[in-house]
Amino acid sequence: SKCRHMHGHRYRWEAELEGDVVTKRGVSEEGMLIDFSEVSEILNTHIHDVVDHAFLVYEDDKLALGALSMMETGHRTVILPFIPTAENLAKWAFEQVEPHITSSYGNSLILNAFHVRETPKSWASWFSK
């Protein structure tokens, strides 16, 4: 498998929300489930800012950790308690984001799924139970 070699991805992180659209007339959130800027802020804080321009490595991959330790100061490495496959990252991202998805407008929001795309044609998803 090509994946055994050290490599990176330009991930795309997608949250899939479910809830009731606000129907109250005259309020600024009428017709909305949530303001997308709120979702973006949650994803930036709990996913993007954590992994952006970082090398993701499994905590038990001693060979990779050894190689990464020889890199220059300032190299961003995120050590994970799981192998960083798209499938595992989708589960991890779901767990990071789900507690922060709240009912913004009294509409009982839930995080239905989280999708992680490695490429435009390759992705993995983690769904709520």
Language-model-detected regions and their locations in the chain:
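Charge-rich, low-complexity N-terminal segments
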Residues: 1-129
